[in-house]
Amino acid sequence: MIALQKSISVSALANMLNDFHSELDQKPVILNYTGKIKNLLSKGDTNVKTEKNELETFILYMAPAKSNSFGVNLCPKASKGCTVACITTSGMMTFTSNILARIRKADFYVNPETRKGFCLQLWKELVNKDRTAKKRGYKVAVRLNGTTDLDFFGILKNQIGKDLFSLTNLVFYDYTKLIGKVVKYQEQIKSGKYFLTFSRSEDNWSDCLAALNMGTNVAVVFGSDSLKPEIFEGFEVIDGDKTDIEMVKVSGKILALRAKGKAKKDRTGFVIW
């Protein structure tokens, strides 16, 4: 582990964290953070794509892969290309304050002494969103894995005995590279309780085919809008950059995404050129 001195400048810290982001192993950074997290969920209108969503959207952003203070991998199937091209390398995600906020939230979850508290706070925030949505007569979209790939439905069930699917005014959606998650939640996916999109990387096409054959959409990153085809590997292509919840409108399709941030320079095969 790498301990940071309290006197380190914010700009130096940002540079170090951005350097760590580009490494597959993502060496952990110890921030010795002991403060409280005011809100785990962020409004989707802070994201260029989610601000176009038809539904009000809330997202949980935490430090991806191993970039938390404990070195625990929160993206267990992240490939080299995925790690380098992570969405945290683009736009507002690169701001130092946002990087630190993601690490604090990840540490709150990863630390065995505070994990239950994390789950209780997340549940409380989601219950409040659900009640507000019911009172106002509309649905609210929630993405719990904005920058991670965890099974929060199982985690909250095991940690505090709460069923996220009981919050019927929330529309849960996510991206994943875990084909086991697609299999596990087939019933909820088919009933419209959970909208899950599988993510292609340079080394998981067989899992992509398995997901497509189950009727699950697969996100594929292309180098530019002009490279997005109408058909990819025999499957219809939908523009996944229109909004962040295009996945709820179709099934068994390819969601074409445009490379952003460091992904624009990817040559690992993660981005298709």
Each predicted region: which residue ranges?
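Class I S-adenosyl-L-methionine
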Residues: M1-W273
